[in-house]
């Protein structure tokens, strides 16, 4: 039995293309892997705090006493990391906002990227500590950006996930959804076909 963690980050709720794709993924995964456990965390509906000058002090080793707000942030960070480590498949629904990922997803990454916990520095360089995972990124875009300099989502997510130890990463693209109904329908159809292939793999 595998455990699947689905991270949603779109601010558009039910109107979101990436949320629709993640919902489709969950449906298909449950159909093919009925014994598996699926956890869905919606980072837009239930946002995590923005890392600031106070909160960053909670995530770095220190003997200084923590403020109540820092204690809350550290507890949440511990919870998010434990959740991430407990799952085998990580599904990230990441729409493109202004060429990059949503703020809500970046805030999540800022709380799970902790030196000595999810990565560490060695004499040979950084080493990821979140290992043995498979990641699937479902990314929707209004325009066409794949394999062009305007796609900052793909390289950033590949880099971040690899940095914390997740190197088995597949991307599913739904592009051109703002180019009209016909293009949007085709983008969804192609993305769902790609999801079907990954779910069955």
UniProtKB/Swiss-Prot annotation:
Organism: Cronobacter sakazakii (strain ATCC BAA-894) (Enterobacter sakazakii)
Family named by the database record: Belongs to the azoreductase type 1 family.
Necessary cofactors: FMN
GO molecular function annotation: electron transfer activity; FMN binding; oxidoreductase activity, acting on NAD(P)H as acceptor; oxidoreductase activity, acting on NAD(P)H, quinone or similar compound as acceptor
Protein name per Swiss-Prot or TrEMBL: FMN-dependent NADH:quinone oxidoreductase
Keyword check for NAD: yes
Cofactor, free-text remark: Binds 1 FMN per subunit.
Reaction(s) this enzyme catalyzes, per UniProt: 2 a quinone + NADH + H(+) = 2 a 1,4-benzosemiquinone + NAD(+); N,N-dimethyl-1,4-phenylenediamine + anthranilate + 2 NAD(+) = 2-(4-dimethylaminophenyl)diazenylbenzoate + 2 NADH + 2 H(+)
Chain positions recorded as FMN binding sites: 10, 16-18, 96-99, 140-143
Subunit structure: Homodimer.
Listed EC numbers: 1.6.5.-, 1.7.1.17
Keywords assigned by UniProt, alphabetized: Flavoprotein, FMN, NAD, Oxidoreductase
Protein's job: Quinone reductase that provides resistance to thiol-specific stress caused by electrophilic quinones.
Coiled coil: none
UniProt-listed Pfam families: Flavodoxin_2 (PF02525)
